[in-house]
């Protein structure tokens, strides 16, 4: 199936004006050197290198807020709120966070190897994984929650890591950072509605995703 959807890119997390871009352009930003310095600095601060905790947290927030971001799950025009949604292309975002350090690499490889993973990369913190996968069939405002549940339950089972139910808003932004090993699979397999059982207890629904990067 041809994918013609152009996700909305924003100049920063504070920006409200969407600019359509291609998946290839997002991939080039992720794998190129444009955001390498900011990503490295953020991770150094997160590791507590050279700053007191309060100063480090403030600097991390500034870096994160200034990074560009994109909205992968809806077509937007004129803004970034629900009233600006013009369509649901079927692409669903997954936040995988809280991964124990000792199994992070294994978890990332499992995600990358899965044929449903369309886009996958390390988040700005270096401790999380962002995944985009596609649904088969029409996605609408009414069935978007079911589509989100289908995809997120799948990755919860695949990784054994809890997925936050509060991250299911369709206009959620994904920060663009530096990951030279980011995955882009244009021919990824699509998921079908109601083809998957519910995730195991504790795998969906946990702490707020507001601090995730």
List each language-model region with its residue ranges.
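Short amphipathic alpha-helix segments
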Residues: 99-117
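Generic recognition of flexible, low-complexity loop/linker segments
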Residues: 79-82, 118-119, 162-163
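Acidic carboxylate-rich catalytic motifs and surrounding loops in phosphoryl-/glycosyl-chemistry enzymes
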Residues: 162-180
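Acidic di-acidic motifs
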Residues: 88-100
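DNA replication initiation on ssDNA origins
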Residues: 1-90, 199-200, 206-210
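Hydrophobic, Leu/Ile/Phe/Ala-enriched alpha-helical segments that form helix-helix packing faces
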Residues: 45, 49, 62, 111-115, ...
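Helical (often loop-to-helix) elements that flank the catalytic cores of nucleotide-handling enzymes
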Residues: 107-110, 135-160, 182-202
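Histidine-centered divalent-metal-coordination microenvironment in nucleic-acid enzymes
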Residues: 93-94, 112, 118-147, 171-177
